[in-house]
Amino acid sequence: MGWHDGCIRCMVGVPFASVIATVLCFAGVALFCGCGHEALSGTEKLIETYFSKNYQEYEYLIHVINAFQYVIYGIAIFFFLYGILLLAEGFYTTTAIKHILGEFKPPAMKGGLISTVTGGPPKGRSTRGRQPVHTIELICRCLGKWLGHPDKFVGVTYVITILWILIFACSAVPVYIYFNTWVTCQSIAFPGKTTTSVSTLCLDARMYGVLPWNAFPGKVCGTSLLAICKTSEFQMTFHLFIAAFVGAAATLVALLTYMVGASFNYAVLRVTGRSDRSKF
């Protein structure tokens, strides 16, 4: 019976929304960073193979791609650490809320998060002498004092969400370019569906700002473009950009879920604090 009660208490304190958001965030970031990195490398190969033979014409593009790839490394590391912090914050604040509302009473939360959130003094301390503090308990207390303020995470997560919306919008640009290229190739493959001459159907990389206007040839037309679309490099890069876009969307959903959960926890703690920790 004691084991069953312990499991029930643990399940009550689990922030399911934060757990789901963390899994979604890690999966989305992994998809965005991994596929985005490889898609940028594939784009570099396509440009230097089919659209320009002079290295100086696409040298700046290579530097930009390398810079984006380093940014991707930073994004992966940041979201890994921040996702863990948000998950820990969800556990701490959910446990504190359940304790305040009388739904959950953790046995070993003395002087940690609950007293930090509720403002109450630590309870149950012995006056006979101070007990030795283990390293893990000390770390938990330090985390509790910092994580017990969901208002901090609401503001930070809000700013991160705004920035990620911009990244999400930027990740749609290469998908749009590759999709237009694929549509053009379909028109070349089935000339009966269009009245335009096949030789005039082209993809001009200079038009999208990928190459300078003096780049040669800079564009590919007709059957040459169709041959590029049939290559495994083009197909793989196109699908990798789509996967990266989906990963960015999943990460955005995870951030919104985090923000809603942190806002709810903050609101509940504020309301219960103003009403002298009364239930509602």
From Swiss-Prot:
Its main location: membrane. Disulfide bonds join 185-229, 202-221. GO terms for molecular function: structural constituent of myelin sheath. A lipid is attached at residues 7, 10, 140, 142 (S-palmitoyl cysteine). The chain crosses the membrane at residues 11-36, 60-88, 153-179, 240-269. Keywords: Cell membrane, Disulfide bond, Lipoprotein, Membrane, Palmitate, Transmembrane, Transmembrane helix. It is found in: Cell membrane. Residues 37-59, 180-239 are extracellular. This is the major myelin protein from the central nervous system. It plays an important role in the formation or maintenance of the multilamellar structure of myelin. This is Myelin proteolipid protein B. It comes from Xenopus laevis.
